[in-house]
UniProtKB/Swiss-Prot annotation:
A Pfam family hit: DUF4757
Residue numbers carrying Phosphotyrosine: Y313
Top-level taxon of the source organism: Eukaryota
Disordered, as annotated region: 185-326, 615-665, 677-704, 831-1008
Coiled coil: 354-439, 782-823
Record's protein name: LIM and calponin homology domains-containing protein 1
Domain LIM zinc-binding: 1011-1077
């Protein structure tokens, strides 16, 4: 805020005055000695700028004066420390006028022209505060350190006085409109404030500029009327916010001036018609104002050398008779030279300007506070985010005990590594097995622990025994003696092929026939026809159930005798599956077909884009016939589970006098058809009659097997996959002849049996059909759901058995409880007697119930129903259906609407069958509750209390039904609670066998709007009555008596202590007697 004071001196550059070296050096030396810390290479102002040294200086003078020092290297932290230092100085006894302004060390000014002078002046203000602090420290009892040499400051104070004299010299131009204040002698005992924040002094114009971040323009601050006389100042004052002296430390240090002051034009520095020459821009006025600032702070009254002599600045005109009262000179413009310098209007105008400045200062303080709080909240947010980031880093690094959590969250790499490790362990254990049974056990154990999925199977490595030829040892005995039982595990295909085909063919002489091989087949299967049939079919997957299933999962044997030849076939599937029974008809989805023909000796290879045809021609006149068929399994049939079925049947008849080998390498194109044709001459048909389903003519010259490879073939790693076709024709040696497709990285074991002296043709194919896979998945899912359903049913049956067992226990315990309760009742119940008149009243009024009139009798049938219903309800407690039953019971009780427990005590014979097992109210000695009104109406809160199971006597076990009853009351709606009479509440709650039926009471206990007495049942009338609205209790004053001793309770002048115990009114004496007798209470 620019000060409206301006002088000619301000128009020229101001040279900084050299600071008085003795005062600076003394102050720095004293601070270093007291705090024990050095300024180092910092100058005086820089060393004190952060306020840390000042706060430590205060703590050294008086320990604990500054409790917390902010050591952050930020300007706002330094400002906080300086404010704490100034507050501590006040506590040491320094006056506010002796303290410097926080902005004297925290420079926020952006003015360049006055920076040197401003710097020097502010440092002098700091030195003066240190001077007074040293003076206070010398007189402080808690301080015993180095004393400040006050004489070193004399030069500083003298120079400041001299500067003041120069500034206040009357040799000024008329255009120098700066203020000259005369000091009041009343201020001689105190120091003027270096903060320049006196309330009524115009010095406060400068103080705001030293504290604000930006200097507002005079247009903002000096608002006024256009007439230049401030005529709206009076109406403007009530709407201005006056500063809070306690809150605003700047305004708190302003001392008041006792006299009214003359006014100046409110907007005298704004350019207008009446005042055009007086307007000078704000920065120029500010220069002069800041030169005056330190002068105003150091008059003779504030000087330690000036004593009590007031400082005079030349001639002055007192306004009042008081010789010591002073006022400020007028700031006259040329047009206003005639205005009296000490007029009241000017002082009012100055006061108005001060108010405006205070408002601006308050606004600045509010903005600063808001900025601090926003900065603090942002800092807290940043701290929280930093903590969260560190926490996440710890989580990712596995620190801070989070490794346990990570155990359950595995990465994909960990899962794959664990799977591979398991497979390696399985391979090693399988290879090291010493017998077939041990190997089967190992595999079965693995299957039980882990699901053998496609991914697991495709990662199983091919055992070494399957990598060599089986032509020399084709018998099953060789397998039994084989040290490597891994021959049953599937090969590893990388990547897993969508389609894999392995054709293994063994061709033997037609003259050899072994009929004993048919012993291994399950049931006679369909004969094979020479027509093209599917050879590759997918199989559904399921886990084997025993060790034999394990073997059959990998291997299926099928044998058939055709035309005097025995064909033994084995098939290994790409997906593990149980054995399947042969289908009796071919399906339409015949995906892969094979046709085999033999024409002659030359080997012909035809290849085009669509197919590869391999013709192997053998010049042999021996009649031969090749027939190979495979039947496609229908996946959704029950035949999937048949272990003894044959999956495919093949027949190849070959006769040769000498073995011949034909080998060809085929590079597969995408749709590929391989033809292997074996021409045959007329052949003996002596065994044709054995064929049951032969569909081709018997004189068929050739059988064809056509293999169509779909385009879904996944190529292996080798750049050019090969198909090697090898036909060793052996005369009498049982040797396996294999047709291999090595591009699948697989070789399959030759099928044989120890019973077979000759080798028969064999074909092995694997295939994968997405449709079959989907069906297999559906079937597996259905199986899992069925197993889950069965397990759930078993659990339900088990729970039902336990529930029935608990029911029996509950009934037995209930029976014993009834017996114990009956004994207690017989010992403690006192017969209830009523007079004949009250009995008549009972009989006449007991029929008033909701919707129906009921005789006041003991309804034994209802009591039986109640008992059965309670038992039924109790039996269902174990099944978590209490709430439903309680609601049902409460509805039933409301529908009955009758009070079924009527006059149980009229006969004096307690009905044990109607006793509720949880009602312990009758266990009190002497049955005090069976007096005139044993069932004083209970509201829902009472019912909840009376149903508490803790009120049972020592020899009676509490049940769970009281809790159910309390829940029953809680779930009632408030309207239902209001509708129920206290009697009905009690009936819905625990039953008392000795409780007589009170007078008939309607739900609102009123007849035609009249309240009924809870004791005698008659309307209250107009007489005196005792009404307890919260409990729905109403009594005639004569009926308001103790239910035990029958003493009057309403006639006491000084008041009566009435207890309501178990529905009865008890006087204090009876209540204390029953309590001392150890009887339980529900209240």
């Amino acid at each position: 805020m620019a000060c409206p004071a301006l002088g000619l001196e301000a128009l020229q550059p101001l040279q900084p005055e050299p600071p008085p070296e003795p005062a600076f050096s003394e102050a720095q030396k004293w601070i270093e000695q007291v705090t024990g810390r050095s300024f180092g290479d910092k100058d005086f102002r820089t060393g004190l700028e952060n306020g840390i040294l000042l706060c430590e200086l205060l703590n050294a003078i008086k320990p604990g004066l500054v409790k917390k020092i902010n050591r952050l290297p930020t300007p706002i932290a330094g400002l906080d420390n300086i404010i704490l230092f100034l507050r501590g100085c006040k506590e040491l006894g320094l006056k506010e006028s002796q303290l410097f302004d926080p902005s004297d060390l925290q420079d926020t000014s952006n003015r360049v022209t006055v920076k040197s002078l401003d710097y020097s002046r502010k440092l002098k203000n700091v030195l003066v505060t240190i001077y007074w602090l040293g003076k206070a420290a010398n007189s402080c009892t808690s301080y015993s350190g180095t004393t400040l040499n006050l004489k070193e400051f004399e030069g500083l104070l003298a120079q400041m006085r001299k500067d003041t004299d120069d500034i206040e010299s009357p040799k000024r131009s008329i255009r120098d409109s700066g203020y000259i204040d005369c000091w009041d002698s009343e201020r001689s005992d105190s120091l003027s404030p270096p903060r320049h924040g006196r309330d009524d002094s115009f010095d406060s114009l400068d103080s705001f500029g030293s504290r604000s971040r930006q200097t507002p323009s005079p247009d903002v601050v000096l608002r006024g009327s256009s007439d230049g006389r401030g005529s709206d100042s009076e109406s403007d004052l009530p709407h201005r916010k006056l500063p809070d002296v306690k809150k605003d430390d700047m305004s708190a240090r302003r001392t008041s001036h006792g006299e009214p002051k003359s006014a100046v034009p409110f907007n005298q520095y704004l350019p207008n018609k009446s005042n055009q020459t007086a307007y000078v821009p704000a920065p120029l006025r500010k220069k002069k104002a800041e030169r005056e600032e330190y002068r105003k702070s150091w008059s003779t009254a504030t000087s330690p050398l000036g004593g009590e002599r007031p400082f005079r600045y030349g001639p002055r005109t007192p306004v009042s008779d008081d010789a010591e009262s002073t006022s400020m000179f007028d700031m006259r413009c040329e047009e206003e030279a005639a205005v009296q310098p000490h007029s009241r209007a000017r002082q009012e105008q100055l006061q108005l300007i001060n108010n405006q400045l205070r408002e601006e200062d308050d606004k600045w303080q509010d903005d600063l506070a808001r900025w601090k709080s926003r900065r603090r909240s942002v800092s807290q947010d940043l701290i929280k985010k930093e903590e969260e980031r560190k926490k996440m880093e710890k989580l990712l690094a596995g620190e801070d005990g989070t490794s346990e959590r990570r155990k359950s969250i595995k990465t994909y790499r960990e899962i794959v590594q664990e799977k591979e490790r398991r497979e390696r362990e399985l391979h090693e254990a399988y290879k090291n097995a010493r017998s077939q049974e041990e190997a089967e056990g190992i595999l079965q154990q693995y299957i039980e622990r882990f699901t053998i999925s496609e991914a697991v199977l495709e990662r199983l490595e091919m055992p070494k025994i399957l990598e060599r030829s089986h032509s020399t040892e084709p018998n099953l005995s060789s397998f039994l003696n084989d040290p490597n039982p891994m021959k049953y595990l599937r090969q590893q295909s990388l990547p897993p092929p969508k389609f894999t085909a392995t054709v293994e063919t063994t061709i033997a002489r037609a003259s050899v026939l072994d009929t004993s091989m048919s012993a291994g087949s399950g049931s006679p299967s369909k004969t094979v026809t020479p027509k093209a049939v599917p050879m590759l079919t997918p199989k559904p997957y399921s886990q084997p159930k025993n060790s034999q299933d394990v073997l059959k999962t990998f291997k299926v044997d099928g044998k058939v005798s055709v035309n005097g030849e025995t064909v033994h076939r084995e098939e290994e599937k790409e997906r593990e599956c149980p054995t399947v029974a042969p289908a009796h008809s071919l399906t339409k989805s015949q995906m892969f077909e094979g046709v085999a023909r033999v024409h002659g000796s030359p080997l012909e290879l035809k290849q085009d884009n669509g197919s590869i045809e391999i013709n192997i021609k053998k010049p042999n006149s021996v009649p031969q016939e090749l027939a190979a068929t495979t039947e496609k399994t229908e996946p959704n049939s029950q035949e999937d589970k048949n272990d003894g079925g044959k999956s495919r049947k093949g027949n190849i008849e070959l006769a040769s006098s000498e073995p011949q080998h034909f080998t060809t390498t085929v590079t597969r194109c995408s749709p590929t058809v391989a033809f292997v044709e074996f021409p045959s001459s007329p052949q003996l048909k002596n065994d044709v009659s054995e064929e049951k389903d032969q569909k081709k003519p018997e004189n068929e010259m050739s059988g064809k097997v056509e293999l169509v490879l779909s385009q879904k073939v996944v190529k292996p790693k080798s750049p050019e996959p090969e198909a090697t076709l090898t036909f060793p024709f052996l005369d009498k040696m049982p040797e396996a002849n294999q047709l291999h497709l090595p591009n699948l990285n697989s070789q399959v074991d030759s099928p044989s049996s120890e019973k077979s002296p000759v080798m028969t043709p064999q074909f092995k194919f694997w295939a994968w059909d997405p449709e079959e896979e989907r069906r297999r998945q559906e079937k597996w899912q259905q199986e899992q759901e069925r197993l889950l359903q069965e397990r759930y049913q078993k659990e339900q049956d088990k729970l039902k058995e336990e529930w029935e067992k608990a029911q029996k226990e509950v009934e037995e315990e209930e029976r014993r409880y009834y017996e114990e309760e009956r004994k207690i009742i017989e010992d403690t119940v006192v017969p209830f007697t009523v007079s004949s008149s009250s009995a008549d009243q009972l009989s006449t009024s007991s029929s008033m119930t909701e919707g129906s009139g009921t005789m006041n009798k003991i309804d034994l049938g209802n009591c039986q129903d109640e008992k059965q219903d309670r038992r039924w309800k109790k039996s269902f407690q174990g099944d978590d259906s209490d709430l439903l039953l309680k609601t049902r019971e409460s509805d039933r009780l409301e529908e009955k609407g009758s009070l079924t427990e009527g006059a149980l005590a009229h006969s004096g014979n307690p009905v044990s069958k109607g006793v509720h097992e949880d009602h312990q109210l009758d266990t009190e000695a002497g049955a005090p509750h069976c007096g005139t009104n044993p069932q004083l109406a209970q509201d829902p809160s009472q019912n909840q209390q009376t149903s508490n199971p803790t009120h049972s006597s020592e020899d009676v076990k509490p049940k769970t039904l009281p809790l159910d009853k309390s829940i029953n009351h809680q779930i009632e709606s408030p309207s239902e609670r209001r509708k129920k009479s206290p009697r009905e509440h009690f009936q819905a709650g625990p039953f008392s066998p000795c409780s007589p039926t009170p007078p008939g009471q309607s739900p609102n206990r009123s007849i035609s709007g009249k309240k009924l007495c809870s004791s005698c049942g008659l309307p209250l009338g107009k007489g005196a009555a005792m009404i307890i609205e919260t409990l729905n209790l109403y009594f005639h004053i004569q009926c308001f008596r103790c239910g035990i001793c029958k003493g009057q309770l309403g006639d006491a002048v000084s008041g009566t202590d009435v207890r309501i115990r178990n529905g009865l009114l008890n006087c204090n004496d009876c209540y204390m007697r029953s309590r001392s007798a150890g009887q339980p209470t529900t209240l």
